[in-house]
Amino acid sequence: MRRLMISWTIGFALLIAAFFGIVVLLNSTVYSAHGFVSSYLDALARHDATTARELPGVRAPSGVETTLLTDGALGTIGDIRLVHDAARAGGVHHVEFSYKLGTRHEASTYSVVQTSSFLGLFSRWSFAKSPLATVSVATPHDPRFRVNGTAVSSSVSSIQSQPFVVFAPGLYVFDSRSTYVIATPVAVPVTEPASVTPVRIEAEANALFAKEVRKQLSEYYARCAKQTVLLPTSCPFGKSFSNRVVSTPAWKMVSDPPVAIGPDGNSGRWFVPKATGQAHLTVKVQSLFDGSISTFDSNVPFEVSYVIEVAPNDHLTITSVNR
């Protein structure tokens, strides 16, 4: 009986030792400071923005757009490795991890602090400083853009930059691809928590934009040419005579002004620079001096330039300007 009691005691002691050994092991790995940071990075790597955002201490600055804190906006993170986990005063740990953003090798350091324990045994942690960062996006030519394929739109003036909160680390590829506009992709690595990274998206008019503007202007010129007056209303061409006109003026288009489209500075509009077209006018004119009648049958050159606004639904508003 005594031998049995000794066996039971030894077994129980071994069980207790094993239990506390597991507690120590878990507190040095899963429930450690670097284990906490690892769970954040792993969530980003598997594009799980919800889990990453719900971790203690992940806080977005007040009043800053959070559109990019989504699964679709996350880039690719790989080869995540612990570099060091250093304890500092006040229970704060500085944890550094290395990783790859695309083909780039990067590293980030996070400050975490122990907040409590689970069941009195397992450590709980929180970010002492939020791991989020900010990208300040300037869209001088078109408010619409994409981040890693996720459609976004700036809500500020074209001359301003709008801040967006993002997870750090992350590789964010900015571009624009709408009906009439395209922008070359810009890859922006964000590695430092609380950092602010400026981004400028230089959109350009695509071939369809120029084609559609040519079409609309050609229809406009054709409507002008149908007016049987010397000075067609709200039209870029016309002709005046000092003598008397004795027949109905007849216009026809000879050549439309060429169309080239570029950004209108930082106004958020587009500009068609000054170009020359030719309209043809046929009309009979009577001299006030001797009463003779002659026919004016010639081309009439005219110059135009335009600004174009693109609405969110891609409707084009083309306005003539004198530049």
Regions found by a protein language model. Give the residues of each.
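Extracellular Ig-like/FN3 beta-sandwich strand-entry sites
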Residues: 90-92, 167-171, 274-278
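Membrane-lipid interaction segments
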Residues: 211, 215, 219, 223-323
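Short beta-strand edge/turn micro-motifs at domain boundaries
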Residues: 100-188, 301-323
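Core segments of small alpha/beta cavity-forming domains
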Residues: 26-72, 204-243
